[in-house]
Amino acid sequence: MNYIKVKGTYDVLPTEAENWVALESYVRKLFKTYNYGEIRTPMMEYSNVIHRETELSDMVIKETYNFKDKSDRDLTLRPEGTAGVIRSYVENKLYAQAGVTKLYYMGPNFRYERPQKGRFRQFMQFGCEVLGSNEPSIDAEVIELAYETIYRLGLKQVSVKLNSLGDDASKANYRQALIDFLTPVKDKLSKDSQDRLTHNPLRILDSKDTADIELIKNAPLPLDYLNETSKQHFDSVLELLNLMNIPYEIDRKLVRGLDYYAHTVFEIHATIKGFGAQNALGGGGRYQNLVKELGGPDTPGIGYAFGMERLLSALEQEGITLTSPKQLDVYFITFDQQSRKKAIQLQHILRSENILSDIDHLNRGFKPQLKEALRYDSKFIIIIGENELNNNVVQLKNTKTEEQVEVSMDTLLDTLKELL
């Protein structure tokens, strides 16, 4: 029997893991700069947290992993981060705290979709949710943070695409106008769009089907149905983005994929080799009713998410590295059991002072050990043989200059601290 990974998943090997750790560290540091606190929620939720009795997105309908536990309770692996964060916000009564709640998250999500390049059934996301304010300034800050996350990584021509769906009243008026426009040509729409016309008509604007694209060329658009309050909100967001010199483009057909969005929706784009027109790296938007739907008080929110696999792929395509080449500080070369025991003792002392060190564990000869030291690009090699043991010294060799000196075992730590 072959034991292989589950379809749509992947292994992160040690060389790749360093890139993941570097990106995670970068993201956490940036969120901290903006005064966001990390929240960690379970990877599975009771299904009613995900499958709420409102309009369901295509993703929730088709792509979630649902199962029953041994007590016959319905559970769902989280397909995205927002629902679990809001559930936790309500359950833990974070809304009782004064002021705005600013949260960020990072972790795996699960969707049963067709695996393809850049798309997986288990995938990593990071994102944020800001709860408790209707002010356009929060929209602008969240967009700023999303933009800066990508811009500071060094990707080219980073920009924001955004739109407004308006408040509930504006969105309802637009939704009906779109249904009225498309119903006469329903039979000409793709199968997916025909299904969406009933439960999620706004997503038809995002269709990639050529027939759909032609049919919606003259469709009504959300911006044309904004009431005065919604228009003022969107204008204020644009004004603040202008003040921060954040480049943006109004995309009148941008709706995003989740049904709870209202008012501002946005995506972050960058020019990336090989990505072509599919250069959106992440996005999000504002929501008005999600907290209330999950049992909390009437609380507005806004958030975004980025797929980490896609972002790491973009960095690789552009030749941007977040890590330095892996390099040991020292590598011990020994010749027998006694010298190996002494090396292990010395190595423990060095490691306790955060000096990166390793030793051979295969009882190999000098040449294989030397080859291993050079493979790890070790800065120094420490050689211990019978003579060194008898005299309580080591041979310390600089691999760059090839200079070799004799150092007392008692002063080895201090010597290395000076040299490293």
UniProtKB/Swiss-Prot annotation:
EC number(s) per entry: 6.1.1.21
Keyword presence, Cytoplasm: yes
InterPro entries named in the record: aa-tRNA-synth_II, aa-tRNA-synth_II/BPL/LPL, Anticodon-bd, Anticodon-bd_dom_sf, His-tRNA-ligase, HisRS-like_core, HisRS/HisZ, HisRS_anticodon
Major subcellular location class: cytoplasm
GO CC annotations on file: cytoplasm
Recorded GO MF terms: ATP binding; histidine-tRNA ligase activity
Record keyword Nucleus present: no
Domain of life: Bacteria
Catalytic activity field: tRNA(His) + L-histidine + ATP = L-histidyl-tRNA(His) + AMP + diphosphate + H(+)
Assembly information from the UniProt record: Homodimer.
The protein, known as: Histidine--tRNA ligase
Organism of provenance: Acholeplasma laidlawii (strain PG-8A)
Primary gene name: hisS
